[in-house]
């Protein structure tokens, strides 16, 4: 699988320095799975953060692997701090900012049907084995999308020309 290698350059004493360069290998220590995500200011603090995929636990029968993205900020010494974690659905074009308390406690499952694609978030039980569904985000397309967007307890998140994004608390 493809990898992303990131160099982080800072100006120290009027010279550029790569703060994530390994003195042993001469290669960046910032190597992660490539997920079509690029460094950006994800939390609008004026500092560019680096995306770092972290595998999420999977269901026993789930074939697809899911990842949260930890967005890391770097100090001039090369030390990294996670400033935000997100879940990205690149196929449907959305992302969700994960509450900090969810980072090690969620499972994710995806599903697609006729003109709907959804991701369900589950909170892992205290026993570590059980899980309870807490949130579903769905992208709805097709001629009947307006009606399907208000089914049950769904509420709107965003509308585009051909897609309506909704969520429901479970």
Model-derived features with residue positions:
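Structural motif
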Residues: 2-13, 56-80
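Repeat-based blade/solenoid architectures
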Residues: 24-38
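Loop/turn-rich, solvent-exposed surfaces of beta-rich toroidal or solenoidal domains
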Residues: 1-10, 14, 99-109
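Short, well-structured beta-strand
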Residues: 9-21, 141, 147-170
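Secretory pathway targeting signatures of secreted, lumenal, and periplasmic proteins
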Residues: 99-156
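Beta-propeller fold detector
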Residues: 18-25, 82-87
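Acidic/hydrophobic-patterned starts of short beta strands in beta-sheet-rich repeat architectures
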Residues: 1-2, 41-54
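N-terminal "mature-domain start" segment
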Residues: 84-107
